[in-house]
Amino acid sequence: MDMIEINGGNRLTGEVKVSGAKNAVLPVLTASLLASEGVSKLMNVPALSDVETINNVISTLNAEVSYDKDEESVTVDATKELNEEAPYEYVSKMRASILVMGPLLARLGHAKVALPGGCAIGSRPIEQHIKGFEELGADIHMDGGFIYASTENGLKGTTIHLDFPSVGATQNIIMAASLAEGKTVLENVAREPEIVDLANYINEMGGNVSGAGTDTIIIHGVETLHGVEHAIIPDRIEAGTLLIAGAITRGDVLVNGAIKEHMTSLVYKLEEMGVNLDYQDDAIRVRVEDELKPVDIKTLPHPGFPTDMQSQMMALLLTAEGHKVVTETVFENRFMHVAEFKRMNAKISVEGRSAKIEGKSELQGAQVKATDLRAAAALILAGLVADGTTQVTELKHLDRGYVDLHGKLEALGADIKRTQA
């Protein structure tokens, strides 16, 4: 069993580079299935277990995938006749596998995709995906753990209003509509930077997607799409995690690949706490010189405060004086890390969807386990400032979303190592 061991107390200084965005590369990889001509080459691809999983899913669909971790690139050739079935063996490992359904429906007119797996955070329903496909003209039914989708006369453009701005549903419907007949208007959509990256990629392939980054996206279907080269945007969640690593240790760190426009709600909250941020071209320098002030956090869909930064921000709030409240509105059951923080002497109580933090916690090193991807990072952040040694286990979660986080922190001066227990 792998374990990360941290001896707390070191101030972090220096420069660090953010890897490519996990939440951008997965939909872009599945969108490569839309290209019936040419080969796609994706650059700045992070070396993550989730990337390997989606590559395996794409390979089972009869696309040729080549993954060069040293070059941080993936090439996808989807010009052959695709298979319709995404099997349970891979899809069960990761929810994002459902994102092959839109491209398969668009290319083949039918798809058979196992119900997905992934992080155990709340219900994360896929009803919005199914609603979108049905409104584009697909017949959907579920049987034996699979979702079956088909369309006799091809997908037809229409107006679709999402009940809530689901990121995955927005991506899946954009991909399906990109080869549909006519115009699709997609309302109340997700506005994340990863949506913009996907739209840019499809447009580079010859598609016609406009409005990404706003709450209404318009897709004019085209007959074919072709492979292209595309660089994945930096990971704003990793960037935020590294900014907090600098802040929590009261350090001085330059985070290359941190783009302010991708993380406005986070940086505003950090500044509200008294963290000094210096904005440069695609980089942010973080410094802390004074006592941090208490702030309240409420997670919301983008551009609100990201749920994927909630647990890391909670770690930082533990080191500030005063009364703080963290409210989680996006996912249910996303306070599982609180029990682990308490093992480290954190003063937190949970009531429903809110966690209350009283005063500054004198964190103590302890053995803790990661309950999900972002909790893993948050526990490591807490370990950076805890008195004594912190051991974080269940690193399979961490490896789904961070490339060499311990190595990057060690290069900044942390006393941290990864071992096999």
Curated annotation (Swiss-Prot):
It holds the Pfam family EPSP_synthase. CDD domains: UdpNAET. GO terms for cellular component: cytoplasm. It catalyses: phosphoenolpyruvate + UDP-N-acetyl-alpha-D-glucosamine = UDP-N-acetyl-3-O-(1-carboxyvinyl)-alpha-D-glucosamine + phosphate. Pathway: Cell wall biogenesis; peptidoglycan biosynthesis. The keyword Cytoplasm applies. The modification 2-(S-cysteinyl)pyruvic acid O-phosphothioketal is found at residue 119. Keywords: Cell cycle, Cell division, Cell shape, Cell wall biogenesis/degradation, Cytoplasm, Peptidoglycan synthesis, Pyruvate, Transferase. Phosphoenolpyruvate binds at residues 22-23. Its EC number is 2.5.1.7. The keyword Cell cycle applies. The active site is at 119 (proton donor). InterPro entries: Enolpyruvate_Tfrase_dom, Enolpyruvate_Tfrase_sf, MurA_subfamily, RNA3'P_cycl/enolpyr_Trfase_a/b, UDP_GlcNAc_COvinyl_MurA. UDP-N-acetyl-alpha-D-glucosamine binds at residues 95, 124-128, 308, 330. Signal peptide: none annotated. GO terms for biological process: cell division; cell wall organization; peptidoglycan biosynthetic process; regulation of cell shape; UDP-N-acetylgalactosamine biosynthetic process. It comes from the Bacteria. NCBIfam families: murA, PRK09369.1. Cell wall formation. Adds enolpyruvyl to UDP-N-acetylglucosamine. This is UDP-N-acetylglucosamine 1-carboxyvinyltransferase 2. The gene is murA2.
